[in-house]
């Protein structure tokens, strides 16, 4: 793992670079390859991108191994930032005493009235804040995040309203945002209004290595459980596309 303080992270290209939040999952990997396309990939192989991942003692830490491999496919720099797990209490993804919900009947019924226990308190707020500070300090002009509001409507930090509010905060709370030059750091969410089927199709169209991705919240010996919300949504997406999941 490379230090964030490495001066080589500074974006020196005419078209300023981007930080991409990369979990190692299907959505963030597709988002990464869309960012790469925005910067001229595959014709341009020297991409001004920095992949940023977080180790917060999540149960599915295998996603970090996947994120390393995915970043290497583009030859871009990759940082894994360690966070104290005490930041993220009250979630089934971080606390062993809380079981990840399985086979949730409300997932597709429209009866979801409560926030799932897989929600991690303030996670995207913290992740985006780290990325924003890193972007401003190192000269990147945008941040890509692969949230989508349709599949994860139960998560408050995946909604369009949240992204809009964070963009306003970035405009008001950074030097770039208040400089009056009109070049504030932009939060880009290319998957925000897409379902899993559309994300899979989009990922395939830009050459994203979906076979390297990991989505399961509660893996068993590194293998998907097949029953958590994320596994079910992923399986449904590939079924609708009519393809076998390349990660299985």
From Swiss-Prot:
Q: Which reaction does it catalyse?
A: 7-carboxy-7-deazaguanine + NH4(+) + ATP = 7-cyano-7-deazaguanine + ADP + phosphate + H2O + H(+)
The note on the cofactor says: Binds 1 zinc ion per subunit.
Q: Identify the domain of life.
A: Bacteria
Indicate whether ATP-binding appears among the record's keywords. Answer: yes
What are the names of the required cofactors?
Answer: Zn(2+)
List the InterPro entries.
QueC, Rossmann-like_a/b/a_fold
Gene3D superfamilies cross-referenced by the UniProt entry? HUPs
Record-annotated residues binding Zn(2+)? Answer: 216, 225, 228, 231
GO MF term set: ATP binding; ligase activity, forming carbon-nitrogen bonds; zinc ion binding
One Pfam family here = QueC
CDD domains assigned to the protein according to its UniProt record, in alphabetical order: QueC-like (cd01995)
One GO BP: queuosine biosynthetic process
The positions annotated for binding ATP are 22-32
Q: What is its EC number?
A: 6.3.4.20
Q: Which UniProt keywords apply?
A: ATP-binding, Ligase, Metal-binding, Nucleotide-binding, Queuosine biosynthesis, Zinc
Q: What pathway does this protein act in?
A: Purine metabolism; 7-cyano-7-deazaguanine biosynthesis
Question: So what does this one do?
Answer: Catalyzes the ATP-dependent conversion of 7-carboxy-7-deazaguanine (CDG) to 7-cyano-7-deazaguanine (preQ(0)).
Q: Which family, according to the similarity comment?
A: Belongs to the QueC family.
What NCBIfam families does this protein map onto?
A: 7-cyano-7-deazaguanine synthase QueC (TIGR00364)
Instruction: Kindly provide the name given to this protein in its UniProt entry.
Output: 7-cyano-7-deazaguanine synthase
Native species of this protein?
Answer: Leptospira biflexa serovar Patoc (strain Patoc 1 / ATCC 23582 / Paris)
């Amino acid at each position: 793992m490379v230090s964030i303080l490495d001066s080589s992270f500074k974006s020196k290209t005419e078209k300023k670079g981007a930080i991409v939040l990369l979990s190692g999952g299907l959505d963030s990997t597709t988002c990464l390859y869309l960012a790469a396309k925005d910067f001229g990939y595959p014709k341009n192989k020297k991409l001004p991108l920095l992949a940023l991942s977080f180790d917060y003692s999540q149960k599915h830490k295998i996603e970090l191994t996947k994120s390393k491999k995915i970043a290497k496919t583009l030859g871009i720099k990759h940082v894994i930032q360690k966070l104290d797990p005490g930041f993220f209490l009250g979630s089934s993804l971080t606390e062993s005493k809380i079981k990840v919900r399985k086979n949730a009947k409300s997932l597709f019924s429209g009866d979801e009235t409560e926030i799932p226990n897989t929600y991690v308190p303030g996670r995207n707020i913290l992740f985006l804040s780290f990325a924003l500070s890193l972007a401003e300090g190192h000269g990147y002009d945008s941040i890509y995040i692969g949230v989508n509001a349709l599949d994860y409507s139960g998560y408050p930090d995946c909604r369009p309203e949240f992204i809009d509010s964070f963009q306003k905060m970035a405009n008001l709370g950074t030097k770039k945002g208040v400089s009056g030059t009109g070049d504030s750091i932009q939060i880009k969410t290319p998957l925000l209004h897409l379902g899993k089927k559309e994300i899979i199709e989009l990922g395939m169209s830009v050459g994203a290595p979906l076979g390297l991705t990991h989505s399961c919240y509660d893996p068993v010996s590194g293998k998907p459980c097949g029953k958590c919300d994320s596994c079910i949504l992923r399986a449904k997406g590939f079924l609708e596309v009519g393809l076998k999941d390349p990660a299985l």
